[in-house]
Amino acid sequence: MLSTTAFAALALQCAASVHPDTAHEVARVESGFNPYAIAEIIPKVERKPGDKGVVSYFPKTKEAALQIVNQIESRNHRYSVGLMQITSTNFANFNTTAEKMFDPCENLKVSEQILVDCYKRGGDILRGLSCYYSGNPETGTKPESDFNNTSYIQRIGFNPPDNKKNWVVPSVKDAIRKENVTQSIKPKEGANKRGNSSRLTQSFHFFMFEPIFSLVNALNQPI
């Protein structure tokens, strides 16, 4: 498992166009900073009542990780690997392999391309992260029973607005966040607001990279 300091240095080197805050939170949720983390995707037809759709593995060595990958491939299941959990169906898109994706820097390089593509297609950080997770801008915002009824963006750190109490005078912090987010996440010219890029179904397009919007500035915005 990589330390926070080690990951930050690696992210700056290998995924320079993604803000370190964003890379950090995605890695935390996706792999817990374990470069050998694996998630096996169980087809619905094979699940029994109560079964989860994903089985997670956290081997301690690359050799053990490759053995697990071989077992998963023998079952013809899809899977995702490494720090940023690159999905097996995307290996061909980026001319890579599971073994290469267990290299932290190589994994970050691929995730950078996907995150940039998703962010530019989605037009803002929420839709971009949903795209990275699921292949569309909406699924990542919906609660999932496999994850204690939390959504992907909640697990990343975004919280839905608290509507339980109707304050006469609202929070100044909420107003500041809303103003900052409004100014920061306006879609760039030419961005496709209804993007459909993903680790699973991405049709990748090359373009000049620009730094992705900082996650810290967007946390807790109303969704």
Regions found by a protein language model. Give the residues of each.
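N-terminal secretory targeting signals
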Residues: M1-P20, Q154, F158-I223
